[in-house]
Amino acid sequence: MVSSAAGGSAKDGSVAGEKTAPIGVFDSGVGGLTVARAIIDQLPHEALLFVGDGAHGPYGNQSMEAVQGYAVAIGDYLVDQGCKAIVMACNTATAAAYETFQKRYSIPIVQVITPAVRRAVATTRSGKVGVIATQATVDSGAYAREFERLCQRQPECGDVTVLSVACPRFVDFIERGVTTGRQVLG
């Protein structure tokens, strides 16, 4: 766990001194540190509390029920630490627990699937989008549902064809910080 935060605590997420309350960020491992880095770059005066679930991760080959349980335990911890918002920096945790988080916590919940889908829709030239993810994320259909939801609300996105492929070995590369080179290409 990486922490640079201070602040009070309440189960509903309300905190005395909101400016010092941290933003909680979590992932099933250390891959979410890239999300934490982006938050620091965009919001340099905000405190962050990062949780990487090395005890249970990676989540990709586990049941959605198990992942939801791990995610809720982390969410409860972050709220107990006084976080004013939670960033779910894990696709699989988002697929398993985002709706639960929205109902359970009275603080803002940010996840990574919607922004990725928006970017893909905005940048595709062919109308075809490839999604590589864990087996659990692909099986959940979370990306396909989000593409469908977005394209229903924004007809200008046209017909987008989504091809989702599980890449279980990719998680190991991300956790080791390997994002380029021959190792990734196999």
Please tell me what each predicted stretch does.
Residues 2-186:
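Non-catalytic structural scaffold of enzyme domains
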